[in-house]
Structures are given as C-alpha cells and as structure tokens.
Amino acid sequence: MPRLFFASKVVLIAAFTLFAVNVSFAQEPDAPPPSRSITSLDFQTQRPKTAPNAFSNDSNAPKSAKRRRNIAALGNAKRKYKLISRLASPRRAPLNRKPKTKPVYVVEKLGVTFWRLRPAKSDEEDAPTFPVEVGKRREQWTAERVDSTTKFKDGDLVRFTVESPRTGYIYVVDREFYTDGATGKPSLIFPTLKTRGGDNRVTQGTLIEIPPSNAEMSYFNVRSERRDYAGEEIYVVISPTKLPNIKLELREQFLPDKTLNKWLDDWGGVVDVYDAEDGGGIAYTGTEAEAVSVKTRSLRLNEPSPQTIYSVRLRQNQPLLVPFRLNARAK
C-alpha cells in the first residue's frame, strides 16, 4: 500500500488537483463570493517586513540573465493569480448547535508550491539539486514549479513546499483514497523526530519542504501497483498551540480517524484556490533552499512567492486547516 514514507524507498502515484472529499460538506454561512484573481502582494504582506536584496547569499545569484529575470518575476508584488476553484468546508455535516456569540470570520492565505524533478538546464547552474536514481546511476536533478492542476505521469518524481502565513505549529496529515470513494487510515507525516529535530514551530514566511531534502528519498515516485488507488488526501494544519495527544515518533505515524474527523468538523472552512499565471517550469532557487534548511530563515517581501495560494475563510483564533488532493491519473 503506497504511503508517504520518507526514510525508505517506496513509490507514490499522485497528481495535484482540487477536490471535495467524498462526504457531505457543510457550507459556511454568509461566505462572500470569491475574487476572480489576486496578486502576490495579497500573500507577501503576510511575510516579515524587512526586504533584503533578492539574492542575500551571493552563492544563490544565477549567472544567466534569463534565470535572473525569471527569479525576479517570482518575487514581483504584482504577480497575478487566477481563481481555480472554491472548495466547500470539509466539515462532514452542518453544525447542529448555535454559538453563544456570532463568530468572527477572517481570511488567511497558505502558500503551496508543487515541484516536479527533472535534469537541470544549461542556464540553471545555480539551481539546487537532489540525488535521483536513474537505472543503475545516481544523477543530480533540480525541481521545477508546476500548477496545482498538473497531471503527473507514471514515474514522475514530485515534492511540495508549504509557506506558513502565521506563527504556530504545523502538522501535515495524509491518507489514501480509492476509486470507489473509500479512504485509508490517516497518517501524520509531519512533524517527525527526524524532520527538523521534531521542531514544528513556524512563523510568517517559514517554508516547509515535504519530503525533507536530506531524507533518504527527497521525492515521491509517481507509481502504484493498485488499480483502485486514486491518490492521496493531504491536510495542512497550523495551530496557535501544540495539538494535544500528539507524541512524535521517528517516522510518520497513524492518526485515529476520529481525531482527523474532529479537526475537520471543528476547523474546516471555505477555501479558494489560486494558481499563478506565470512561473511554471522555473527551477528551484537557492533562496528557497536556504529558507527550508535554516529554521530561523523566513521568506521576505521580494523573494519568490508560491505557485499556488489557498485563501481560507475561518473563524478567528482557530487553527488554520487547508485540504488538497494528490490525484492519480487513471490507468
């Protein structure tokens, strides 16, 4: 059974698309219609206010003029994002009880970038690379940005990064789903004691990579032996405080269904999904690699923005919960 295991060589079949879980979703009351488009400034204002030179580390600066232009475009405050979909609240049923006071709703934005590994191009000598097994050889490949609607083919190698919009503690949960709508057991795949030493605290602009670049396998291999396997459901949770009853282990661990269901019922909200109009195919940057490797390093105003933005309407002071799917291409 495919799982998102980082420390051992397993295979995963996936394609990142938008979804509604196969259960009865509750609609948020009085949710305003979504904006048809946004700019990266809507997201970047969540980051620390200091704005260093785009290439704070000289070793990150590319030699190619085209590459420099591409990276500069990723940090442009006027970068445009188009609305892809609105996801209903993942609550399994409407709330049966009326709150004592009318809840206050706020909007927060989570950044996600999906990456597909490939050999580096001649003008990408600055791009960080990952060791890849190609037959009996080991090669160094880089990763290129792809949109949330990308359909990955069998054998693609994929990663994703998550940028936090707030200070708190981040958790990433995964479970399989199948063509008949059934789902597998959920697993907590981040944090573990092997990732960042178990430290899952994040601040505005913190970038988290999955899988970690220092893992035995720093990518997911898109492949499956099950014909009824349809993909993976991923849930990102950022809580103001550490979640109770979560004891970290060296590897990912199973999470009780009732725990995930309670999170969905308590924290689920309407999610608007936006993909950038540009940036597809641009290789991983040294700035992003530096941000994921240094826990105290946050992305700042003029540094690369994510390829996909999830705009979430949630109740004030509650954990942020963002769902997305890794869909398998039909065989």
Predicted regions and their residues:
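Bacterial N-terminal signal peptides
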Residues: K9-V21
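Secretory-pathway glycoprotein ectodomains that are cysteine- and/or Ser/Thr/Pro-rich
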Residues: F25-K331
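N-terminal secretory signal peptides that target proteins for export/translocation
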Residues: M1-A7
